[in-house]
């Protein structure tokens, strides 16, 4: 995660965010697509910021949006093999990453979901055959 206005963003931070949040998931999907059995699935967690960007988090939001766009595209490619590419977009989750940002300081945020709650919701979606997990799917 990284926080701060666009004027505070340096190239190294931008590169790190895209490497971790966009390039890595895309490469993992590329490398695993041939290994996933027909009817299988691939899950990525982009988070709510992929489709609902937040002020002061432009680079982080953009990196997550890039992964979301790739997952959406590849989901169409793999549909004929009945492989579900699920991009989960949970709201703020208490992973501790906000307090260990690679740049900037996190604003005060409301208490987020627990990682266990997010994982349970994703597993339930897989079992139920859900293909879309927007932020609303994580509402209690």
Positions of the model-derived regions?
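Active-site loop immediately N-terminal to the catalytic Tyr-X3-Lys motif
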Residues: 54-58
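Substrate-binding pocket helix/loop in short-chain dehydrogenase/reductase
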Residues: 5-6, 10-15
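Short, flexible catalytic-loop segment of classical short-chain dehydrogenase/reductase
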Residues: 3, 90-100, 104
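Active-site helix of classical SDR
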Residues: 29, 63
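C-terminal helical subdomain
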Residues: 87-88, 103-140
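Active-site-adjacent segment of SDR/Rossmann-fold oxidoreductases
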Residues: 35-36, 52, 73-83
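Residue(s) in the substrate-gating loop at a strand-loop-helix junction
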Residues: 47
